[in-house]
Amino acid sequence: MANAYKQAGVDIEAGYEAVSRMKKHVQTTMRKEVLGGLGGFGGMFDLSKFALEEPVLVSGTDGVGTKLMLAFMADKHDTIGIDAVAMCVNDIVVQGAEPLFFLDYIACGKAEPSKIENIVKGISEGCRQAGCALIGGETAEMPGMYSTEEYDLAGFTVGIVDKKKIVTGEKIEAGHVLIGLASSGIHSNGYSLVRKVLLEDGELSLERIYGRLELPLGEELLKPTKIYVKPILELLKKHEVYGMAHITGGGFIENIPRMLPEGIGAEIELGSWEIQPIFSLLQEVGKLEEKEMFNIFNMGIGMVVAVKEEDAKDVVRLLEEQGEMARIIGRTIQGAGVTFNGGTAL
């Protein structure tokens, strides 16, 4: 029967080898609350030691999107897992939640043990950066659904926060200061446009360095999404944060309003932070308007937090002590949506 399954395109032995290879990476993510080991039907996590008055679980799920196609093209698979973790944990930390555990889903056309190991190696690195345990996952070999070189990657995370400490944004008022935390680059959104502009229409090479880039284009595009969990959790211990936004698909224009209450808008001061060269390259090669750029990409800012003006300098200092590049990038105002430089809507 095993031979028949292999003839159908599913290699059970390769799957077993992949699981064996990934165990050493998964083990590095373990927390004391994890019960059982890898390979059970379900992952278990003990919540009994959390001394919270009203514990609330916060969940998030996401994928890496077409950034995966860059990994296929470059045959580099050891960092794309960081992206999968980042997209999930950054989404729940903006509500004040500490990520507890993570599960992954890998669907592929052919289970190559070394490739699967590299993917999980990246996932494990992301989990370590976020302080959460990789307690389970699924690797599905699906011949006919994907080509032998292709795979899809998604993840799921659960975190915890005391109900009274949930960050909702509902108390944001006009005059609060917006602090931006620098991104590592494009992160994990907008890659369908990136590929069209730079690779299809622009015919740029992944091996060459262009313009002010410091790395070959392929390395620049595969930079992992920054994980903000540890600095944000440290910030929440020391200061009151009124709202946070993870700048993902939809850029500034769509994501900042998600943290703002009705009647409050955001005014952003262009020039208050450095926009990385990769965005300038995209805009130049693709002849994209500035509004499009801010409506698609993070433009150098991966996370925005709203604090009182009297706390702003201390918050910037704390974040920089945590290794982040933090800048005051704007303020909240009466109104709606996002405007730039004194009320100009892009």
From Swiss-Prot:
Membrane recorded as keyword: no
Disulfide bonds: none
Subcellular location per the Swiss-Prot or TrEMBL entry: Cytoplasm
One term under GO cellular component: cytosol
Pathways per UniProt: Purine metabolism; IMP biosynthesis via de novo pathway; 5-amino-1-(5-phospho-D-ribosyl)imidazole from N(2)-formyl-N(1)-(5-phospho-D-ribosyl)glycinamide: step 2/2
This enzyme's EC code(s): 6.3.3.1
InterPro entries named among the record's database cross-references: PurM-like_C_dom (IPR010918), PurM-like_C_sf (IPR036676), PurM-like_N (IPR016188), PurM-like_N_sf (IPR036921), PurM_cligase (IPR004733)
Classification via HAMAP family: AIRS
The protein, known as: Phosphoribosylformylglycinamidine cyclo-ligase
